[in-house]
Amino acid sequence: MLRLIVATHNPNKAKEIKDFFKGYPVEVVSMKELGIEEDIEEYGNTIEENALIKARFLRDKVKEGIVISDDTGLFVEYLGGQPGVYSARFAGENATYEENNRKLLKLLEGVPYEKRKAYFKTIIAVIEGEKEVLLEGVLEGHILDHLQGENGFGYDPVFFVDGIGKTLAELSLEEKNKISHRGKALLKLKEYILKRLEEN
């Protein structure tokens, strides 16, 4: 049985990963379940650095099992890759999704659709002992000039998925997970963990 420890205080993220490994000899445990309540300061300049900072923090606390952590950013080409590592706090510390979206739309006001290319990227850092691996999932699209769709969260209502003809907020959770950056990164995590199970 492999033990997978998730560096998150978000119960939804932990549950998502637990569901992902249902039926496999993998025990998924969150920080909360281990009684680790501290907030991890994300001071990295990239989402890769932030994912590693969180995973290393937890690895140093638990010293066993496989530790995973993830970070996600939205990168808009016209804005030189912004909001990127600052996606969650684009409009300021503790900004709401609505405030972040409003700031993004304001910065892109008058910019034609073909110049509004963007991509979401999720990085999952996997640490086992001294071994560190980064897994990546990317989803390409464009930023609309208005909100569209009721589902999802964050930038989902403004992110129009190339090849699907809908925003992420117009997809069901199941549809979103099949194509999303996070879904792609989680599939790579699953491949990695299943390979580890074979080695055991």
From Swiss-Prot:
Organism this protein belongs to: Caldanaerobacter subterraneus subsp. tengcongensis (strain DSM 15242 / JCM 11007 / NBRC 100824 / MB4)
Biological processes annotated in GO: nucleotide metabolic process; purine nucleoside triphosphate catabolic process
Keyword annotations: Hydrolase, Magnesium, Metal-binding, Nucleotide metabolism, Nucleotide-binding
Entry-linked PANTHER family: INOSINE TRIPHOSPHATE PYROPHOSPHATASE (PTHR11067:SF9), INOSINE TRIPHOSPHATE PYROPHOSPHATASE/HAM1 PROTEIN (PTHR11067)
Keyword Magnesium listed: yes
Listed InterPro entries: dITP/XTP_pyrophosphatase, ITPase-like_fam, RdgB/HAM1
Active site, per annotation: D71
GO molecular function, one term: XTP diphosphatase activity
Assembly behavior: Homodimer.
Binding site for Mg(2+): E41, D71
EC number(s) reported in the record: 3.6.1.66
Short name of any one Pfam family annotated for the protein: Ham1p_like
Family (UniProt): Belongs to the HAM1 NTPase family.
Cellular component terms per the entry's GO annotation: cytosol
Function, as annotated: Pyrophosphatase that catalyzes the hydrolysis of nucleoside triphosphates to their monophosphate derivatives, with a high preference for the non-canonical purine nucleotides XTP (xanthosine triphosphate), dITP (deoxyinosine triphosphate) and ITP. Seems to function as a house-cleaning enzyme that removes non-canonical purine nucleotides from the nucleotide pool, thus preventing their incorporation into DNA/RNA and avoiding chromosomal lesions.
Residues reported in the UniProt entry to bind substrate: T8, H9, N10, P11, N12, K13, T72, F153, G154, Y155, D156, K176, H181, R182
Catalytic activity: XTP + H2O = XMP + diphosphate + H(+); dITP + H2O = dIMP + diphosphate + H(+); ITP + H2O = IMP + diphosphate + H(+)
Cofactor field: Mg(2+)
Protein name, entry field: dITP/XTP pyrophosphatase
Cofactor note: Binds 1 Mg(2+) ion per subunit.
